[in-house]
């Protein structure tokens, strides 16, 4: 707006020129579709800290990891994994998979989690075909009565705990020299690496939890026979403080705005490359949810 006003004022002037330019630029549909905004609109609501163990399960896929061997002629197989985590305790499981078929992933989660631990009420996952396939949906809803919560690929923060575990997992995996460890199975070196990595995650102190995941699950230390009594009230309060702090930091970057039914909004096109139109729309808001999200009528307003 300022640059447009400065450019026009070099040659022209009229009464209420500033207001006219501001209104024209602010309501220009072409400008809003083509120019990418750095700041997002609307403050994010504060989430409630999770502190009930085994109530929710977060799952995702990680990989493929490809590591080149330093030994000539030795090829290290590609690593592809399913990761599972209880966000309340931080307890973590990881298992390799051969393909991304819905039935394959469903069997892994059933065998590596649902037959080992208390059944969750809710499972959080993304929109990958392996998670929305018929076999996976039937396992969750028909076999175990678990409600699925599908997050948007545009909002990975909704499954942020999994992303943090993936980062830790990647760091630990890269720290191993597979080909130089004589104790690893040369045909399947990843099985030993994943077992050691999972133990490292479970037995490491988490600042958010103020404990090790293993301590919260078993009530004792993972290495020494030392009892651990979890204060879930204090854990919840600490988690909520961190959520509140991060929420303030995130909202400080956003433009305050209260969405209303009937508003017209642009929808960001996350698949667009840098030369394509970054926004689509405008679309009409049909409903504003209590968590700050909105439901759109997916027919562009003309």
Map each language-model feature to its residues.
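Domain-scale segment recognizer with a strong primary affinity
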Residues: 26-28, 35-38, 56-58, 120, ...
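Conserved hydrophobic/aromatic pocket- or pore-lining residues that grip, position, or stack substrates
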Residues: 21, 60, 90, 109, ...
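Conserved short alpha-helical interface segments
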Residues: 14-32
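Reverse-transcribing Pol proteins
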Residues: 1-10
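Structured nucleic-acid-interacting core domains from mobile-element enzymes and related host factors
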Residues: 39-58
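Active-site beta-loop-alpha junctions of metal-dependent nucleic acid enzymes
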Residues: 77, 94-116
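An active-site-proximal beta-strand-loop segment
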Residues: 53-93, 98, 271-272
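Short catalytic-loop micro-motif centered on adjacent basic/acidic residues
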Residues: 95-96, 122-126
């Amino acid at each position: 707006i300022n640059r447009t006003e400065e450019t026009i004022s070099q040659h022209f002037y009229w009464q209420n020129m500033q207001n006219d330019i501001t209104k024209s630029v602010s309501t220009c549909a072409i400008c809003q579709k083509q120019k990418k905004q750095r700041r997002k609109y609307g403050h994010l609501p504060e989430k409630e800290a999770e502190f009930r163990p085994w109530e929710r399960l977060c799952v995702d896929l990680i990989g493929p990891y490809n590591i080149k061997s330093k030994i000539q002629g030795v090829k290290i197989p590609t690593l592809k994994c399913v990761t599972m985590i209880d966000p309340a305790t931080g307890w973590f499981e990881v298992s390799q998979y051969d393909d991304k078929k819905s039935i394959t992933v469903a069997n892994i989660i059933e065998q590596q989690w649902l037959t080992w631990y208390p059944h969750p009420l809710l499972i959080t996952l993304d929109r990958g075909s392996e998670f929305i396939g018929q076999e996976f949906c039937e396992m969750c809803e028909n076999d175990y009565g678990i409600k699925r919560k599908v997050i948007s690929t545009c909002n990975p923060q909704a499954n942020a705990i999994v992303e943090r575990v993936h980062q830790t997992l990647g760091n630990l995996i890269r720290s191993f020299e597979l080909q130089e460890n004589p104790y690893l199975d040369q045909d399947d070196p990843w099985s030993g690496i994943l077992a050691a990595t999972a133990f490292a995650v479970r037995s490491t102190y988490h600042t958010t939890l103020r404990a090790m995941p293993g301590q919260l699950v078993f009530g004792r230390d993972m290495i020494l026979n030392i009892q651990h009594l979890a204060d879930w009230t204090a854990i919840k309060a600490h988690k909520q403080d961190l959520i509140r702090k991060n929420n303030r930091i995130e909202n400080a970057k956003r433009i305050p705005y209260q969405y209303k039914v009937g508003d017209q909004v642009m929808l960001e096109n996350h698949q667009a490359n840098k030369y394509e139109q970054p926004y689509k729309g405008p679309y009409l808001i049909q409903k504003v949810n209590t968590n700050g999200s909105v439901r759109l009528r997916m027919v562009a307003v003309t």
